[in-house]
Amino acid sequence: VNRLLGRYMNESLFALTAGIATVEEIDKAVSDYVMPIGPLALRDMNGADIGLAVASYNYNEYGPRFAVPALLGEMVEATVLGQKTGGGFYAYDKETRKRAGVNPALAPLLTKALAKDPTCEVLKEFCNKENLAESLFLSMINEAFLALQERICMPEDLDPALMAGLGMRSGPLELASSMGLPVCLAELERRSTICADKGAFSAAERFRPAPLLKRFVWAGRSSVF
């Protein structure tokens, strides 16, 4: 669960850093799509420091497709950690701890993060506000196929685990089947190629299609189940 969640959480930070959508737009798109809470609100609950530790572990464990978003490091350095410090992606009322809009301290951190990782800009070639939710979950779908390929779990167990653990209304395999496996594969290949052509090789690795997904499509399957 945490491995698949990590891919999607990272992509939300890359999209924010690239300026594809605002904090509130990202969270709303995801909540409207399939999640009970947006990734940035969730990160504020857990803390950017925890997020950075988990992202760093995943990178060391799984490699370049888990590249650590520069924004997390900037937030930790500035002690803009989330609810625990009174501000993260959102600002929080000191009395009630309720959200009080987007945190104004975030803007300069986004500028610094983009300067450290300008390849985030390549996301604008294929990600926009209209396809934002699908774009963020495409990485989770791909990671789900990698997990199946490694025989970490059976297909019939993966979606229930994500739905129980994260409160998703539909799991990644159901999402993939709804989109169509050929569509998922074509979109991942397109994105990986665009990133590589632009010299964003780390980003290209994030979208490299899972071999199992390729095999499913080559076998003529349009859905998982």
Predicted features by range, described:
Residues V1-F225:
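N-terminal glycine-rich phosphate-binding loop for ADP-containing cofactors
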